[in-house]
């Protein structure tokens, strides 16, 4: 990790929905839900370099995605009114490891990581709550990545209660297909009236994913992967997919099952986390730079204890 006060490197983790209940539909078209969010230690990496050219650059350029439509760029633009110095700019390098369109929140995580980093590097001094409030404009999953704790979530996913969860190993599988979230949430057969549960019920008994049957119907490869993974335990879908996961008590068993995963699917073994790896790395950066006179007053008060 680079501890230069003008540079910062942060991991940008994936999340899992340990269950996902859809409890209603709002007048604006969004769905009310309940879910348990847990981070995993499978991460992208973002490198930030502070500039003084008032420009936001992101590399590498993603084909068929204009920079202005990139969630990282949009997150940075949200913070430009709060910059300590109007000349501040940022160069961002994204190193991808997380699969796109997998239901593990890669794009939301990247946007949240940008909010957290620029809040410090640009001296914005916004609270985590304010960052989450800004972030939800870009995506319902962004607040949990901003807040950085495993959570029981309600609303569209932005109402968060901190929880402590077991931290098992997970086998994560990505079938070779892309799930359209819009297609899933507009399907007339999607369950939208699951009765709400209490957080105590969620922590003790868990739940299911209301999207699973519809996702399998539209995506035969997800169904195939689900049936395969189900041979080894309680296979689950995260978000609207396409990623599936299975929890294990130990690393050896997770690796053993992964070794037999069909090669046509991507697979990873990862560990559950109750604190986002982004926050752990950011707090380490701040601790390292507390004593630097010309940077101390720029550090966000939400992180300086």
Swiss-Prot record:
One of its GO terms (molecular function) is ATP binding. Gene3D superfamilies: 3.30.230.10, GHMP kinase, C-terminal domain. It comes from the Bacteria. The active site is at 15, 141. The keyword Mitochondrion does not apply. Belongs to the GHMP kinase family. IspE subfamily. This is 4-diphosphocytidyl-2-C-methyl-D-erythritol kinase. It comes from Marinomonas sp. (strain MWYL1).
């Amino acid at each position: 990790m680079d501890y230069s006060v003008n540079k910062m490197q942060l991991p940008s983790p994936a999340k899992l929905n340990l269950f996902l209940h859809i409890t209603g539909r709002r007048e604006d078209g969004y769905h009310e839900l309940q879910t348990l969010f847990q981070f995993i230690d499978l991460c992208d990496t973002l490198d930030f370099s502070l500039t003084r050219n008032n420009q936001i650059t992101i590399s590498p350029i993603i084909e068929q995605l204009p920079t202005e439509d990139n969630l990282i760029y949009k997150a940075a633009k949200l913070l430009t009114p709060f910059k300590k110095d109007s000349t501040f700019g940022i160069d961002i390098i994204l190193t991808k490891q997380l699969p796109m369109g997998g239901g593990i929140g890669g794009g939301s995580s990247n946007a949240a990581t940008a909010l957290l980093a620029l809040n410090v590097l640009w001296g914005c001094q916004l609270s985590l709550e304010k960052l989450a409030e800004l972030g939800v404009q870009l995506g319902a999953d962004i607040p949990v990545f901003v807040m950085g704790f495993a959570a029981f979530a309600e609303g569209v996913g932005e109402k968060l209660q901190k929880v402590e969860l077991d931290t098992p190993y997970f086998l994560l599988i990505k079938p070779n297909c892309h799930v359209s979230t819009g297609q899933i949430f507009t399907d007339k057969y999607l369950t939208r009236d699951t009765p709400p549960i209490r957080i105590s019920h969620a922590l003790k008994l868990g739940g299911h994913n209301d999207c699973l049957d519809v996702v399998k119907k539209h995506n035969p490869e997800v169904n195939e992967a689900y049936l395969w993974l189900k041979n080894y335990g309680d296979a689950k879908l995260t978000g609207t997919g396409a990623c599936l996961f299975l929890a294990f008590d130990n690393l050896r068993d997770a690796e053993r099952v992964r070794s037999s995963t069909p090669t046509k699917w991507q697979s990873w073994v990862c560990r559950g986390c109750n604190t986002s790896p982004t926050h752990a790395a950011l707090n380490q950066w701040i601790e390292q730079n507390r004593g630097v006179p010309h940077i101390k007053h720029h550090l966000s008060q939400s992180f300086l204890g």
